[in-house]
Amino acid sequence: MSKNVFTVKKLVFCAMAIALATVICAAIKLPSLPNGGSVTLFSMLIICLAGYWYGPVPGLICAVAFGILQFIVGPYFVHPLQVLLDYPLAFGALGLSGFFSNKKHGLLLGYIAGVLGRFIFHEISGFIFYTEYVGNVEGNLLAILASTVYNLSYLLPEMIITLILLALPPVEKAMARVKSMAQA
């Protein structure tokens, strides 16, 4: 007999995380960049919480679902491969947080892993985007640099703000309480 990955409670918690993160992405964008990407108020954290609460499989499924929803709500791509890289894979990487769910400082480590994974997929996508404009070796190096600067300009500020918030003792305690409630 196989164990269900999702109970009704897990589905509800994951659906609420997806809904809340989607509303935050749509309603509260600090700087919004012209080619996609923006600093949001903790939307990546909210998706990473699903992995932190329930482990890698529910975390990855929830994060991929969020990525698909982000594509439906506001797609931006130049090359068809970017659809896969920028949405289900990049946002899906936030579910990597689930691999740290039972570790000390699991939320912090999982969040960093998720954002790093998201960065890697956006970096590959950005390289594809920028190489549409340049075609030689020097151009490829410039494409990598341009993609790195562009992606870090919104991912890094949000990550730093979130890590500062998560390092606060009251927030750390609150997150532990929410995790026990989600798992009860």
Model-predicted segments: where are they?
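Transmembrane-helix signature of polytopic, membrane-embedded enzymes
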Residues: 57-65
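Interfacial aromatic-anchored transmembrane helix boundaries in multi-pass membrane proteins
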Residues: 23-39, 64-99, 130-135
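Alpha-helical transmembrane segments of multi-pass membrane proteins
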Residues: 44-48, 86-94, 159, 163
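Short helix-perturbing small/polar motifs within transmembrane alpha-helices
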Residues: 1-4, 10-23, 62, 82-127
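Membrane-embedded alpha-helical hairpins and interfacial helices in multi-pass inner-membrane proteins
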Residues: 32-37, 75-84, 103-184
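Short glycine- and Lys/Arg-enriched binding-loop motifs that mark or flank ligand-binding interfaces
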Residues: 47, 51, 63, 106
